[in-house]
Amino acid sequence: MKRILLADDNPGLRSALRLLLETRLEFELIAEACDMEHVLAQVEDAHPDCIVLDWELPGRPTRERVSVLRALVPHLKVIAFSVREESEQDAFAEGADVFVCKSEPPTIILDKIQKICQQEESLAKPTYPLD
């Protein structure tokens, strides 16, 4: 089960994403945050596998976010989540693993989260016998 932190300053959107994530047994929503201060505290305390991060979340310049988060949890998968499609290039340049536009259909959002989590699992599994 992949442990997910959901970070967005819009409570309605957090609620919708929570309901969406709860439809999948492979995800465990371990925490929610509404600003970067809470994100940093939750990441440090809970050590999630993945964060769905509102790219415009208040609290810290975007150019520092991914590096600060990975300093706390090196294996953390970062999904940049934004209403602005033009943020995609910036998100990847700053180290995000996946970009999701908030206007995308729920099935696409779930698929992207699932793919990045499966990618981590396949990298962690050895491809040779363990004799």
Q: Could you say what each language-model-derived stretch is?
A:
Residues P11-A31:
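Two-component/phosphorelay signaling modules centered on CheY-like receiver
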Residues E104-C117:
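C-terminal output helix
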Residues I79-F81:
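Hydrophobic/aromatic residues positioned on beta-strands within the core alpha/beta folds
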Residues D8-D9, V83:
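Acidic di-acidic motifs
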Residues V52-L69:
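Conserved phosphotransfer microenvironments
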Residues E32-C50:
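Acidic, metal-coordinating helix/loop segments flanking the phosphotransfer/catalytic sites
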Residues E64, V83-V100, I108:
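Alpha4 helix (beta4-alpha4-beta5 surface) of REC/receiver domains from two-component response regulators
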Residues E120-D131:
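CheY-like receiver
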